Structure formats: structure tokens, C-alpha cells
Amino acid sequence: MGRAYQNRKESMAKTSDAKAKVYSKFSREIYVTAKSGGVEPESNLALQGLIERAKKAQVPAHVIDKALDKAKGGGGEDFAIARYEGYGPGNSMVIIECLTDNPNRTFGDVRSCFTKTKTKIGTQGSVSHMFDHAAILVFAGEDEEAVLEALLMADVDVSDIENEDGKISVFVPHTEYAKAKTALVDAFGAIDFEVDEIQFLPHMTKPIDNEEDRELFEKFLEMLDDLDDVQNVYYDVEL
């Protein structure tokens, strides 16, 4: 069994409200990524991967273009990355990534999700030491030796490579993301990445055996998902 990462294939939202939420989260992340790293996907690999993910989630082109245009224009909202962590229901370990223009509001909203589920938000580092901050690149392939060689030739610090069900999964420290992706594309040409993300990966995962705690954990995730500022939630729970 491979490393536990979240393969967030954004499913088609069933309602207009759900679609609007998905579009808004992608729009905000595209804007911030383009503003910080440049609006050209060819030179901003994080933006390139994000746009591909947005397209797979069926985000309309006009939503993507509007976010890029806003980043080109300068000014606009001043979003900052905010990260919170703590112990959720069932003694789960949770990391919450946000993009916010009002950190005080966002902290209050996230803390409320903990409070309403009778859990407590933690201090920075309280659970993140039990996660790896890693880049994950997954694509169709069989020859993991060739992939490893290409990465090592480019002096990429490789954490792990898996070959399972006709797919190769590459794990590298998040700081090696651009170098690893460039090395793979240089070696093998255009690649359709099934997963192209930076995530927090738990060192170990566990089930929540108590049904009441499991239901409360799922409610906790739903509450976080309803917050506009929350972009990603990482946890050590097997659902």
C-alpha cells in the first residue's frame, strides 16, 4: 500500500452553490499563485499545475482568465496564506490551509469549527511535525528506474517513488517541486499528471473506530469546507 495522499479529483458539483464554491476557491488560489510567481504558466510551474487541476474540475475558462487578468493588473485583494492545526474529533490530527484577506476573521471561523465539535485548535507545530510537506507527481508509466534516474541526474532530492497499477508516484520535499517537475518533463516530454500538488502527508494514518467520533469528524470537515477562506484540509484519518 502506497503513501496516503489525498487524490482530490474534484467531482462535479451537484448544485449551483457547490459549483460557485469550487470556482471561488480555484479563482482565489490561481490569483495568489499568479501574483506571487508570475502569470505565465510556462515559467510558473505551480500555476501550470493549478490551472490543469481547475480544468479537470470543470472550472470555466472565463473564471480562470479573470483570475489571471486580476493578477496581471496588480493591486486587487491582498490575500495571505494562513495555516492552522490541531486535534479534531477522534483525536485526529488536522492541518488547515487558508487564503485570507482578514486573518482575524479566518482564525475565528476555523477555531469555531474546533469549538463546535468539542475539540481545540492547537499552536503552530502542534501536529505538523507528524506530517511531511511534500510535492506529489503522479502519472501513467511503468519504468520507475528510468524516472528515478532522470530525477537523480537533475540532482532532485527524492523522498520516494511508487509504481502501482500502471502509475508512477513521485514524492519529493515541497522545496524540490519545480526541479522535479522540470526534470520529468525534460526527460519524458509532455506528461499528463494525474496528481500535481503540494500537500501535507501524515506519517501514519488511522481509522476512527467510534461511530459517534467518526460522524463528528465528518461534520467537522463539512464545516471547514463551508468556509470561503479554507483551501485545503489535511488529516491522518482513514475515511
UniProtKB/Swiss-Prot annotation:
GO CC term (a single one): cytosol
Domain of life: Bacteria
Keyword list, A-Z: Cytoplasm, DNA-binding, Transcription, Transcription regulation
One Pfam family this sequence matches: Transcrip_reg
InterPro entries, per the entry: Integrase-like_N, TACO1_YebC-like_2nd/3rd_dom, TACO1_YebC_N, Transcrip_reg_TACO1-like, Transcrip_reg_TACO1-like_dom3, YebC-like
Gene Ontology biological-process entries: regulation of DNA-templated transcription
GO molecular function: DNA binding
Keyword match Phosphoprotein: no
UniProt subcellular location: Cytoplasm
Family of this protein: Belongs to the TACO1 family.
HAMAP family: Transcrip_reg_TACO1 (MF_00693)
Name of the featured protein: Probable transcriptional regulatory protein Tcr_1104
Protein species of origin: Hydrogenovibrio crunogenus (strain DSM 25203 / XCL-2)
Classification lineage: Bacteria, Pseudomonadati, Pseudomonadota, Gammaproteobacteria, Thiotrichales
